[in-house]
């Protein structure tokens, strides 16, 4: 089961007050519903590939309206051939749509979120819950970048949904797609807040656990990479120093170096693997600091560079 499916399974088990049930149902019908108009009047199909969501829609309608409801199952013919669940209404459809504020004046479809679902905080959260059940998806936080989105067919509804999300400070963004619009979030903290708002608390804790592990792993990787880079830099410097000392020894001899540089050059050749700090402690004339060793080795490098360029070393 995908992470998004786990969230939706949890959401379909939440019990709410009547006002919140209608807010959730309004989002589900608006986003997943298809209205047909004939001489007999309206008919409504609310379609989903998730059995738990289909049962949720069926129950919300039966609990709040005295309307005959059918629950149909069809086999999807393309691709994975998943089941498609259809909640079908043939009676009192206009009454339902008008009470949910999805149509006005019999035939005018309302594309935005009704103000009656924005008056109470519980209803706003329930509308968002219904919107995620209808069109929400989320990347697996264990294997992908953080991303949660809600798909909408209509731009007006996507814009009002974005506005509702951002009333909670979620920094939701809107993007046009080929066949609709998505409202999405990529910040882990905002996704966590959204899961809390819609009541997906189990999913929230799982998401936070995954996030903590990922952050720790990333911190360790950055630390290892930093230490590896420093080690490579140290090894590279030591290799260069040794090569320069050997060049001086082959060409003009180490005795051409000042005494202090001779001493550190011989120690560098003798103890190739030790750190600058350890090298400084080996100086027989008296231990010197790491920066002191580094200064002398730089002087040796400069001496070697003069030889490479054919310059006078006197």
Curated annotation (Swiss-Prot):
Residues 275-309 bind DNA. GO terms for biological process: cell division; regulation of sporulation. The gene is whiA. The keyword Magnesium does not apply. It comes from Oceanobacillus iheyensis (strain DSM 14371 / CIP 107618 / JCM 11309 / KCTC 3954 / HTE831). The keyword Electron transport does not apply. Keywords: Cell cycle, Cell division, DNA-binding. This is Probable cell division protein WhiA. Belongs to the WhiA family. SUPFAM superfamilies: Homing endonucleases. InterPro entries: Homing_endonucl (IPR027434), Sporu_reg_WhiA_N_dom (IPR018478), Sporulation_regulator_WhiA (IPR003802), Sporulation_regulator_WhiA_C (IPR023054), WhiA_LAGLIDADG_dom (IPR039518). Pfam families: HTH_WhiA, LAGLIDADG_WhiA, WhiA_N. Involved in cell division and chromosome segregation. GO terms for molecular function: DNA binding.
């Amino acid at each position: 089961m995908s992470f998004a499916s786990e969230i939706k399974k949890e959401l379909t088990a939440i019990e709410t007050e009547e006002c919140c049930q209608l807010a959730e149902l309004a989002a589900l019908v608006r986003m997943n519903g298809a209205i047909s108009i004939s001489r007999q009047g309206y008919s409504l199909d609310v379609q989903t590939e998730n059995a738990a969501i289909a049962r949720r829609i069926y129950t919300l309608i039966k609990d709040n309206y005295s309307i005959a409801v059918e629950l149909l199952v069809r086999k999807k013919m393309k691709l994975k051939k998943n089941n498609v669940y259809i909640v079908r209404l043939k009676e009192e459809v206009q009454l339902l749509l008008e009470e949910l504020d999805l149509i006005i004046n019999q035939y005018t479809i309302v594309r935005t979120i009704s103000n009656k679902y924005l008056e109470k905080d519980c209803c706003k959260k329930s509308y968002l819950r219904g919107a995620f059940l209808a069109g929400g998806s989320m990347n697996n936080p264990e294997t992908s970048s953080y991303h949660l989105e809600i798909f909408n067919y209509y731009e007006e509804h996507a814009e009002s949904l974005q506005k509702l999300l951002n009333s909670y400070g979620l920094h939701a963004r809107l993007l046009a797609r080929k066949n609709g619009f998505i409202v999405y979030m990529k910040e882990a903290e905002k996704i966590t807040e959204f899961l809390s708002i819609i009541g997906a608390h189990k999913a929230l804790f799982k998401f936070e656990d995954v996030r903590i592990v990922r952050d720790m792993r990333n911190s360790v990787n950055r630390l290892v990479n930093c230490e590896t880079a420093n080690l490579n830099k140290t090894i590279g410097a030591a290799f260069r120093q040794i090569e320069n000392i050997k060049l001086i020894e082959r060409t003009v001899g180490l005795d051409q170096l000042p005494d202090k540089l001779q001493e550190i050059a011989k120690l560098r050749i003798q103890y190739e693997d030790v750190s600058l700090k350890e090298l400084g402690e080996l100086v027989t004339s008296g231990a010197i600091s790491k920066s002191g060793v580094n200064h002398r080795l730089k002087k040796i490098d400069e001496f070697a560079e003069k030889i490479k360029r054919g310059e006078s070393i006197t």
